[in-house]
C-alpha cells in the first residue's frame, strides 16, 4: 500500500471529483452559518434558555437585590449653604503634598471663625479672582461632612471685590479638575 501524501490526495480527488462540486460545498457552508446565526438570535422563551423542560419562568419569582459594591456608600447630595463675612486669615494648605488649596477664615458675626476651602491659587489666578486678604466675601458652598464639628465649607461660588468666582459645579465637583 502506497501511503505517500501526494498519492493519497490524488485518490481522494478522484473519488470526490464527480460527487461534490465547489459550489455545493460553498452553499452548504452558507446554509450552516445562517442556521447558526438564526439559532443564536432566537429568544430564550423558544429555546428554553438552557433550562431543562423549557417554558417561561414566572416573573413573581424574580427578586430585586442591591448590587454589592464594596467600599461605596449611598450618595446623598449636600445642601448648598450661604455664607458671608470678612476674611480674617488666608492660608494655602497642602502645597507640600502637591495639591495646594487656598483656605480662608471669615468672621461672619457669630463670634466663631468659619473655615472655607476655596481653590488652588493657580486656578484663582487663571480665572482672575481678586485677593481675599481682608476682603468682605459672600457666596454659596457645601459642607460634605456635616457630622464633623467645625467641618470646612467648600465654595461653589464666591463674590469678592465685586467679582463672582465660580469654583465648583452643582454637585460640588471642582471646576479646575474638568478636562477641557
UniProtKB/Swiss-Prot annotation:
Residues 1-21 are cytoplasmic. It is found in: Magnetosome membrane. Induction: Part of the probable 18 gene mamAB operon. Residues 43-180 are lumenal. Disruption phenotype: Cells have a weak magnetic response and make magnetosome membranes. Magnetite crystals are amorphous, smaller than wild-type and irregularly spaced. Deletion of genes mamH to mamV (amb0961 to amb0978) gives cells with no magnetosomes and no magnetic response. One of its GO terms (cellular component) is magnetosome membrane. The chain crosses the membrane at residues 22-42. Keywords: Biomineralization, Magnetosome, Membrane, Transmembrane, Transmembrane helix. It is a single-pass membrane protein. Belongs to the magnetosome MamS family. May play a role in magnetite crystal growth and size. This bacteria makes up to 20 cubo-octahedral magnetosomes of about 45 nm in diameter which contain membrane-bound crystals of magnetite (Fe(3)O(4)). This is Magnetosome protein MamS.
